[in-house]
């Protein structure tokens, strides 16, 4: 059972599993699946989307995005974000993230919105792994 801590304005319930704090039940669900399947991943990865710059006399801060998971799998980097509700800010950052990695075919960017999508995606990865073993 996942203990709840506090609900935020989007209805997410923050949870703690194994001493790790998650912003939502969906994020915690994916963490548990990745860990149970022994997958190599990093959690809460910060990515610079737009570097800091100077405009006239003003210093403009860098624009960053925190992606929930960076999964290293079959020679690829898979950035996974769990978000049940898409805000206008998250949509823009998602597009900037895709733009940042557009020339890197070994990079995948995935946005999972439900536990059903999480199960389906991890299932596809496991099937792909089995196919590679047969080759």
Q: Model-predicted segments: where are they?
A:
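Electrostatic, structured charged patches in enzyme active sites and in nucleic-acid/phosphate-binding
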Residues: 1-135
């Amino acid at each position: 059972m996942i203990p709840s801590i506090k609900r935020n304005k989007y209805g997410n319930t923050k949870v703690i599993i194994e001493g790790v704090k998650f912003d939502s039940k969906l994020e915690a669900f994916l963490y548990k699946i990745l860990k149970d399947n022994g997958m190599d991943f990093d959690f809460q990865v910060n990515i610079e989307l737009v570097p800091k710059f100077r405009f006239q006399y003003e210093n403009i801060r860098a624009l960053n995005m925190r992606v929930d998971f960076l999964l290293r799998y079959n020679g690829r980097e898979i950035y996974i974000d769990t978000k049940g509700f898409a805000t206008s800010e998250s949509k823009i950052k998602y597009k900037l993230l895709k733009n940042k990695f557009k020339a890197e075919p070994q990079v995948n960017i995935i946005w999972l919105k439900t536990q059903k999508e999480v199960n389906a995606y991890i299932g596809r990865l496991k099937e792909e792994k089995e196919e590679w073993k047969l080759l």
